[in-house]
Design a protein with these regions (language model features):
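Short acidic/glycine-rich loops and adjacent helix/strand connectors
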Residues: 1-135
Length: 135
């Protein structure tokens, strides 16, 4: 998510992204809308459905200019990710009473997210399992 630091908050983009990744803070459940990732036509490659492209725009072609909209989308994704993970951690804290967290996987390598989580009043310790992939 290194590109996120070059982006800006865009309210309309954030609203679109909220529909892409839903989160219920009462149950701790989240879902990536499968219609935007898996279900539907894939005219732009295997990663993007046509519906995703309709909402967020065409993916960047190799060697093409890096437009600000890509950085803004990365910013919006980072923002959404941080909010979901921090809210989920708070939900887990309320469910278990634990103030210690263990993270693993590619998302756990996101140092901006980890810094934000570490600053939460309900967090005492975070262990991040270091052997993860980022694919």
């Amino acid at each position: 998510m290194g590109l996120a630091s070059y982006g800006n908050y865009q309210k309309d983009l954030q609203k679109k992204l909220d529909k892409f990744i839903s989160f219920d803070s009462e149950t701790g459940e989240f879902e990536v809308n499968p219609r935007l990732r898996y279900i539907g036509d894939h005219s732009y490659g295997s990663r993007f459905t046509d519906e995703f492209v309709e909402i967020f725009g065409k993916p960047r072609e190799d060697e093409s200019a890096l437009e600000s909209r890509y950085a803004d989308l990365a910013f919006a994704l980072q923002y959404r990710l941080e909010n979901i993970v921090c809210t989920l951690a708070q939900w887990l804290n309320k469910q278990t009473g634990s103030r210690n967290f263990c993270l693993a996987g590619g998302v756990a390598m996101n140092c901006v997210l980890n810094g934000r989580l570490a600053g939460k009043e309900f967090v005492d310790n975070i262990y991040i399992q270091p052997a993860a992939s980022d694919n």
